[in-house]
Amino acid sequence: MPDGIDFKDLHRRFDGAIAAFKHDIASLRTGRASANLLDPIHVDAYGASMPVNQVATVSVPEPRMISVSVWDQSLVGAVDRAIREANLGFNPIVEGSTLRIPLPELNEERRKELVKIAHQYAEHARVAARHVRRDGMEHLKKAEKDGEISQDEARVQSDRVQKMTDETIAAIDKLLAEKEVEILQV
C-alpha cells in the first residue's frame, strides 16, 4: 500500500480508547462486589499516594463483601480512612490487619447517578475515538497534499478510518448498554 496511514497504530489507539472505557466502568459499583471498586482509592503510605492494591490484597470472599488484607499493620488506619473518605458509600469493618467492606444495597437514586457517570465515561471514550479519527484524517490530507497518495487512495483510506471509528463507537455503546443493565438490575 502506498504511504498514508499506519492502520496498525490507528487500530491500537482505537483499542486503547475501548480499554480505558472498560477500566473506567469496571470501577462503577453494581449490586455485586468486585475488587475493581477500590481502584480509584489511593492511600497515603510511605510518603506517597499509592493505590490500595499496592499496600494490600483485595479479594471478594462473598458476593456482597470485599476483603482488604493490609500487608503493613501500621497502614490499616490509613487504608480505612482512605476508603471512608472516597465517598463511595463504603463503611469498612476493621478486624486486625483485615478490613471487611459490606456492600449496602443500591437505592434507585444512586443507580441512576451511576448510569449518568457511565454515560459520561462513554462520552469521554467516544471523544477519544473521534480524536484518533481526526488525527488519521489530518495525516491523510497532508499525505494527499504532499503527493504521497492519490485522491482516490485518500478517499479509500478515509472510508476505512471512518469505518474503524464507527466500529469503535459501536463497541463503546455496546459496553455501555451492558453496564447500564448491570447497574439497574435489582
Swiss-Prot record:
Repeat as a keyword?
Answer: no
MF GO annotations: ribosomal large subunit binding
Which UniProt keywords are present, listed alphabetically?
Cytoplasm, Protein biosynthesis
InterPro entries, A to Z: Ribosome_recyc_fac, Ribosome_recyc_fac_dom, RRF_sf
Pfam families given for it? RRF
One BP annotation, GO = cytoplasmic translational termination
This protein's GO cellular component annotations are:
cytosol
The protein's matches in CDD domains, at most eight in alphabetical order, are given as: RRF
Where it sits in the cell: the answer is: Cytoplasm
Origin superkingdom: Bacteria
Please tell me where this protein is predominantly located: cytoplasm
Q: Which SUPFAM superfamilies match?
A: Ribosome recycling factor, RRF
Write down the PANTHER family for this protein, in alphabetical order.
MITOCHONDRIAL RIBOSOME RECYCLING FACTOR PSEUDO 1 (PTHR20982:SF3), RIBOSOME RECYCLING FACTOR (PTHR20982)
Q: What does this protein do?
A: Responsible for the release of ribosomes from messenger RNA at the termination of protein biosynthesis. May increase the efficiency of translation by recycling ribosomes from one round of translation to another.
Q: Give the similarity note.
A: Belongs to the RRF family.
Q: Which HAMAP family match?
A: RRF
Protein name, UniProt field:
Ribosome-recycling factor
UniProt lineage: Bacteria, Pseudomonadati, Pseudomonadota, Alphaproteobacteria, Hyphomicrobiales
